[in-house]
Curated annotation (Swiss-Prot):
Cofactor: FMN
Organism phylogeny: Bacteria, Pseudomonadati, Pseudomonadota, Gammaproteobacteria, Enterobacterales
Keywords: Cell inner membrane, Cell membrane, Electron transport, Flavoprotein, FMN, Membrane, Phosphoprotein, Translocase, Transmembrane, Transmembrane helix, Transport
Organism name: Shigella dysenteriae serotype 1 (strain Sd197)
Name of the protein described by the UniProt record: Ion-translocating oxidoreductase complex subunit D
Major localisation: membrane
GO CC annotations, alphabetized: plasma membrane
Membrane-spanning parts: 20-40, 42-62, 78-109, 123-143, 148-168, 214-234, 242-262, 267-287, 301-321, 322-342
Gene for this chain: rsxD
Oligomer and partners: The complex is composed of six subunits: RsxA, RsxB, RsxC, RsxD, RsxE and RsxG.
Length: 352
């Protein structure tokens, strides 16, 4: 009998980076569809702007660095960066904002470090945070979901608002943000934080139209459930591992439950945390970035739990209504330390 001698590794994963990125893009379809349904065509326009900007920015840098443009663009990482940023910002944000954020994410947060695999921070979240800090008003100007909105825009009107700031009939963001109660609407998390600080009781807050959903905020609960469905599909396809999403969601739910039990007058209930904002998007599509997340199983559990704790702390006591982006970046900082202390022991070697 003849034995073939082969060098390690002895097991192989045939999935290329482009294949994994494509799976993530496909898994985003339910979440995108839900955002289109509840927040209008602006989401699609932002995705198109971000995608084109990401591809052009990456191609420009690769050309300047004299690297293969076609081969690198085929990995779909630039497209995914643009997509994640586009679905994270308000659907009617000015066109130049998504372009600026995407270009910053690709050139500064990714290519400046050497490209895919070298960046320590999630590029899409870097772009988001830069926009949020620089343009807080525009970045928090979300439309009310269609079920409680007074004005529902068509595709052409959405384009006009994004590029000119008003509709053909003269409507602007102030009128478009009005809900059925005649009050400018915000996200469920933003509404809760602002109302508590204004001295409103939780009973009063829960009567607002934005909380007319079955489980959490109107529209937002279904958007989060759609992102959850896409995330479960990614797990089924084995494109991501379960450790980070599970530890993130369990930690966030546990902290929110304990906080709500001890201080129900000032802290949001767990279902609002889990089904509002970017919770499910962050859990399955952002935190699971293989480049910027921990690489060991124990490390992934710690990484996800840390992010969940940070999200709850920022939402409950910080200055921003949704803390997913900041939590992701802060958790990214700790990855080298987490990996160092959770790396598995080499068989046959003792510690120390």
């Amino acid at each position: 009998m003849v034995f073939r001698i082969a060098s390690s590794p002895y097991t192989h994963n045939q999935r290329q980076t482009s294949r994994i990125m494509l799976l993530v893009l496909l898994a985003a379809v339910p979440g995108i569809a839900a955002q289109l349904w509840f927040f209008g065509w602006g989401t699609l326009v932002q995705i198109l702007l971000a995608s084109v900007s990401a591809l052009l920015a990456e191609a420009l840098v690769l050309k300047l660095r004299k690297q293969s443009v076609a081969a690198t663009l085929k990995d779909n990482s630039a497209l995914l960066t643009g997509l994640l940023l586009a679905v994270s910002i308000p659907p009617l944000a000015p066109w130049w904002m998504v372009v600026l954020g995407t270009v910053f994410a690709v050139i500064i947060a990714k290519q400046l470090y050497g490209g895919l695999g070298q960046n320590p921070f999630n590029p899409a979240m870097i772009g988001y945070v830069v926009l949020l800090i620089s343009f807080p008003v525009q970045m928090t100007s979300w439309l009310p979901p269609h079920e409680i909105a007074v004005n529902i825009l068509g595709f052409i009107d959405a384009i006009q608002v994004i590029f000119s700031g008003h509709t053909a009939s003269g409507g602007d963001m102030n009128t478009l943000r009005l809900g059925i109660d005649g009050i400018s609407q915000a996200t469920p998390l933003d509404t809760f934080k602002t109302s508590v600080r204004a001295g409103h009781s939780v009973e009063q807050i829960m009567q607002y139209p934005i909380y007319s959903g079955i489980l959490a905020g109107a529209g937002w609960q279904w958007v989060n459930l759609a992102w959850l469905a896409g995330g479960v599909w990614l797990l089924w396809q084995k494109a991501i591992r379960w450790h980070i999403p599970l530890s993130f969601l369990v930690t966030l739910a546990l902290c929110a439950t304990l906080g709500w039990l001890f201080s129900p007058e000032t802290l949001a209930a767990p279902q609002i945390h889990l089904l509002s904002g970017a919770t499910m998007l962050g859990a399955f599509f952002i935190l699971t970035d293989p480049v910027t997340a921990s690489t060991t199983n124990r490390g992934r559990l710690i990484f996800g739990a840390l992010a969940g704790l940070l999200v709850w702390l920022i939402r409950s006591f910080g200055g921003y209504p949704d803390g997913v982006a900041f939590a992701v970046l802060l958790a990214n900082i700790t990855v080298p330390l987490i990996d160092y202390y959770t790396r598995p022991r080499v068989y046959g070697h003792r510690k120390g």
